Amino acid sequence: MAGNRREFSRRHSLAQVNFRFLFHKECCMSEKSNQIAGASSFTDENTIPRRQMLAWLATGSVAGAALLSGMGRANAQTAAAVPAGKDLEPTGATKLAALTAALAATRRHRKFKKVPMILTHPDQWDSAALDLLLHYRGSPKQVWDNTDISRPWLNLMRNSITAQVWSFRNADFIAISATHGTCHLALYDAYVWEKYNLPAVLGHKFKRNTFLDIPAKVRNASAADYNDPLGLFSPSANCLPLLMDRGAVFLGCHNAIWEFSGGLLAKGHNPDHLTHEELAADLTNHLIPGVVLTPGIVATLPLLTMAGYSYAK
């Protein structure tokens, strides 16, 4: 048990060192102008490793405050929800750790002005991040077809990761959420939930995006005590941030964004009087940190299965 604690501490210290390097590297990178589909030049805070960023935020440092300010209130909800210093990827998961670092350092497209109904160029989605997932060499690999937000979709993913890691000892196992349908609403930040009144869209079953909340009872739980019935690997930990900290990846769906934006327009939920292309861009720009946007989930699923991911529903 003591050895596990030392390993978690060692990995977190290394993560903080890597953050300083990657943060400097990212700040020095020049932005490219993107002429595709009316998109402006883009950058994204997600290129900074999320776990290291949260460690800075927790210290109250000037750099951390600047990052939080740049993220905006909505994305700050996601950041503030994650217990600083928690590294929940299993010990020995070298391939998963490398993938997580590569994904964190990969730029996302989040400053669109307009997006079309059908995406026709890789610059319009997170193609580099998706390629990393398609070429991941760890195993086993599983993709969950998640559509219904009322189902225990996060619980199923958590159970799968837990049994793979602790029972079958597959440290490099990865679970991906192929997110569409109403589940896709969980991938929007607080800005979208407030601006477009998503609680009403979901029949007031949720007052806000509670999928980003980490319950208080697990915040101080030990990552070393994996059998704690109320701990970080228990049903109490069914939330997006903790699953992401365990290496899970959530795919976004442009088709779901386009169709949902059309539904908002039809119902008059368009406070800024945007066009369909502009409203879809607004939703795209406010996906939570860490999401990998695809041109369409049902089209991406065959690519994932061809790449060795087992389909689960």
Pin down the residues of each PLM region.
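N-terminal secretory signal peptides
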Residues: 1-48
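C-terminal segment of N-terminal export signals and the immediately downstream linker at the start
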Residues: 68-126, 130-133
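Acidic/histidine-rich, surface-exposed loop or edge segments in extracytoplasmic proteins
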Residues: 130-147
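Histidine-anchored nucleotide/phosphate-binding helix
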Residues: 152-168
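Acidic helix-start/capping segments at beta-turn-to-alpha-helix junctions
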Residues: 170-192
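A glycine-rich helix N-cap at a beta->alpha junction
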Residues: 197-223
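Glycine-rich, aromatic-bearing surface loops/beta-hairpins
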Residues: 265-313
